[in-house]
Amino acid sequence: MTFKKRILYAVIILLLLYVANIFISTGYFRTITNNFEGSILQKIKLPGAEDITISQIDSFAIVSSTKRNKFPNKTQETGGLYFIDLKNKAYQPIHLTKNFKKPFAPHGISIFKTGSVYTIAAINHTEKGEFIEFFQLINKKLKHIKTLKNELIFSPNDIVLLDENSFYFTNDHKYKQGIQRLAED
């Protein structure tokens, strides 16, 4: 066997080992077993529920929900934020953003309480870009405070409020479309 063939075979073997390592390390061949031993209190029908955050102090949950279409979106998706009173065993969701006039497809959400007022931050995916919407929750009603747009917010996924004016957020992709986005997924 010639020297060039040996080098070629070595490169192919290394490449195959690298690809195998990617599949193994990312859990591609792993089997997940459902071991849930709890009970479901009630199924709540919300299309495309994405995130939930709970106020343990005041016993309620806020759920972000958007009927998800295929990616990339061909039309603006419509979603909402929902309030669920955890003290009321009916667990009826109240649509908090039904009167919000902007396109709204929420993703990650976070809440922060100051006094008796909750600030809610929601990632918003629209056809015109990615935004973070800020609301105040007072007596089960939302008031829109502001919209934040920034070049660093290009593929936001989740957010956590540190206070009513400070937060962390994550971008879950570097690329919006094309082969690079496919490779990231």
Region locations from a protein language model:
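Short, Lys/Arg-rich N-terminal segment immediately upstream of the first membrane anchor
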Residues: 1-5
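Hydrophobic membrane-insertion alpha-helices, especially the h-region
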Residues: 6-22
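Alpha-helical membrane-targeting segments
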Residues: 20, 27, 178-185
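A short helix->beta-strand "capping" segment at the edge of beta-propeller domains
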Residues: 26-47, 86-95
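Beta-strand-rich domains and repeat architectures in extracellular enzymes and scaffolds
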Residues: 40-79
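Blade-loop segments of beta-propeller domains
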Residues: 49-50, 68, 74-123
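Beta-propeller blade signature
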Residues: 78-87, 131-138, 185
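Asp-box/WD-like beta-propeller blade repeats and closely related beta-sheet repeat scaffolds
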Residues: 99-177, 181-182
